A protein has these predicted regions:
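Non-Sec secretion/translocation targeting segments of pathogen effectors
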Residues: 124, 178-207
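Short, surface-exposed polybasic-aromatic patches that bind anionic ligands, especially phosphate groups
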Residues: 126-150, 157
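A broad, low-specificity signal marking well-ordered, structured residues that form hydrophobic/aromatic
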Residues: 24, 144, 205
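Intrinsically disordered, low-complexity segments enriched in small/polar residues
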Residues: 29, 91, 104, 123-126, 141-143, 170, 188, ...
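Mixed-charge (acidic/basic) macromolecular-recognition segments
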Residues: 3, 7-121, 150-174, 180
Length: 207
């Protein structure tokens, strides 16, 4: 998460002051959540990103690993809003850490089967794990196996109006009166110059 002051300082550093320039785009992302940045674009809303960052920072390690596994299979990743809702619906999933493949999965679930000890060396754990994965619709992600266990996925977040005030950080830099006057003068001078160029071009075309 970040703060309004940090956002203002960054915008001022790149010349986005809300007067001369208002638009910007994000060229890169950095963070510790595996795979998250594959689903973020250069035009994301800063308040939404910060809200997501705040929610992720509140997750314990096991839920964070579960979140990473879910997004690895591409579920609820079409927008930042989807990702925000996912952080609040992780109880709809079951995550099995260190289950890396079908054989691991088969061995894990076979513990509940009444397999005689003398037959365990002949049991096809990989085939059994494959059947379990197919039947459950599970996914092998970096770090473990993820499966959705509930369809009760709720939409807690719809749009930016749902962002708590304490998570809102976007604000243009605060300019002094002198800085504001200089910015407006630059805009006016630029508009006058552009108007003069258009007039000169029109006169040349008429001649």
């Amino acid at each position: 998460p970040t703060t309004t002051e940090e956002v203002q300082a960054l915008l001022k550093r790149i010349g986005v002051d809300g007067v001369r320039y208002e638009e910007f785009f994000i060229t890169s992302f950095d963070g510790d959540v595996l795979g998250l940045y594959d689903y973020l674009t250069e035009y994301e809303n800063l308040d939404e990103l910060n809200h997501l960052a705040c929610l992720l920072s509140e997750l314990d390690q096991s839920d964070l690993e579960k979140f990473e596994a879910v997004i690895d299979c591409g579920s609820h990743t079409s927008s930042v809003a989807d990702l925000i809702n996912l952080t609040q619906n992780l109880d709809c999933y079951e995550f099995y850490p260190d289950i890396e493949n079908e054989e691991d999965l088969g061995r894990y679930f076979s513990e509940d089967l009444p397999i005689p000890d003398e037959l365990k060396d002949y049991f096809d754990y990989e085939a059994y794990g494959r059947d379990v994965s197919i039947n459950e619709g599970g996914h092998f992600a970096p770090g473990g196996y993820i499966v959705q266990t509930s369809g009760d996925f709720k939409e807690f977040y719809r749009d930016t109006k749902d962002i708590p005030a304490e998570h809102r950080v976007f604000s243009y830099p605060k300019l002094s009166i002198r800085e504001q006057m200089a910015a407006y003068k630059e805009i006016i001078d630029g508009s006058s110059l552009e108007g003069y160029r258009k007039l000169s071009n029109k006169e040349r075309e008429e001649r």
